[in-house]
A protein has these predicted regions:
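Sequence-structural signature of mature extracellular/luminal beta-sheet repeat domains
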Residues: 1-355
Length: 355
């Protein structure tokens, strides 16, 4: 597989030969955050040439997109809403067909949110590890708790302090069905003693068996009637047999897979990272298999069970991808960085209204 190798500021990156054509075939683009400081947009120019645009966005972590028109981005202590300012069929002078402009921010606190989504009612909900619950944005409070695991000690109130490290949620028809967690611990930092095989996927309604024995699981997602999951500490991506409560690996990669989104019927984008530092992560199975961990966006062919295309990142600053969203129908998205001078000058005006 031949590659295109390029350099972008403190990062170097390489694209597999077929990635450009695949983006055109699927008519999509990808946004992802790296190292909590940059947002990248992987897309195409009007002539089809692949592009990677880089935006300073300090403390950018989890993100999600709605209808390729709205972005929600978690930064250090806020959730931002960004809206596309371009009418359909219009582009910027540089050829971008989406321009996401910051519109509002909700202050939630330093919660370490790894996953967020819109529910069936259009509300922003998110995984809240710092308080061991699923939460919703609230107009009065920093957040409103919606659910906590049954093993937590106080069912009528949330517990402050990361006990089990909730890591992801699966929604079906806009309702949460499953939640992933590093451990089933009711005590603060208890998850750190269960990293090897204490991970779990819980059916929040209790209709199916929990999936046990996982290693730092992330990003449970429904797709075409099947539940998929990242077993991040082993580098595995696979399906969940919800009837038997069993994780069935489909492929393994040499990276800590944290983010997942599906594109069309047959493909999934996986975000692989260098495993986290720290003594508690030193003995992860991913570190013991002999393969050098990579930082990359990997396009998995679900029918073949293999990686079809890659965008790989190199250099000392290419380490962790924290959030990723696919934008179907968007060829080359751009955004106005949250703390740039441009945010003061990009002004969008609606139609005249009656007073």
């Amino acid at each position: 597989m031949s590659n295109t190798f390029l350099e972008l500021r403190e990062y170097q990156y390489a694209f597999s030969a077929g990635l450009e054509g695949w983006l055109a075939q699927e008519n999509t683009s990808l946004l992802f955050s790296m190292n909590g400081k940059n947002l990248f947009a992987l897309g195409r120019k009007a002539d089809g040439q692949i592009t990677l645009d880089d935006y300073d966005c300090e403390h950018a972590f989890a993100l999600t997109a709605a209808q390729s028109q709205t972005l929600y981005l978690f930064t250090r202590f806020q959730i931002w809403r960004m809206e596309n300012a371009l009418p359909a069929g219009h582009t910027t002078d540089a050829g971008h067909d989406r321009l996401f402009v910051p519109k509002s921010a909700n202050t939630v606190g330093r919660l370490g949110i790894p996953d967020l989504a819109l529910d069936a009612d259009g509300a922003v909900i998110f995984i809240n590890p710092g308080f061991n619950c699923i939460s919703r944005l609230d107009e009065r409070y920093n957040f409103a708790p919606l659910w906590q695991p049954p093993f937590m000690p106080t069912p009528d109130r949330v517990t402050k302090g990361d006990c089990c490290h909730l890591s992801g949620m699966a929604l079906r028809e806009g309702r949460v069905t499953h939640v992933s967690s590093y451990a089933q611990s009711p005590v603060v930092d208890g998850w750190k003693n269960a990293i090897q095989n204490g991970g779990v996927l819980l059916d929040i309604a209790g209709h199916s068996e929990p999936v046990l024995g996982l290693t730092m699981p992330h990003a449970p997602r429904w797709h075409n009637g099947q539940l998929w999951l990242m077993n991040s500490g082993t580098g595995e991506f696979g399906r969940v047999d919800v009837t038997r409560g069993v994780f069935e690996p489909v492929l393994r990669v040499s990276g800590f897979v944290r983010c997942l989104c599906f594109i069309g019927d047959h493909y999934a984008a996986l975000a692989a990272s260098i495993p986290p530092d720290g003594e508690e992560f030193a003995s992860l199975p991913l570190r013991q298999n002999g393969a050098k961990p990579t930082c990359a966006i990997l396009i998995a062919d679900l029918e073949r069970g293999e990686i079809a295309h890659t965008a790989s990142f190199f250099g000392k600053n290419a380490r962790e991808i924290f959030g990723m969203a696919a934008l179907p129908g968007a060829r080359r998205p751009a955004l106005v960085p949250l703390h740039s001078d441009a945010i003061q000058h990009v002004v969008t005006v609606g139609e005249m209204q009656n007073i």
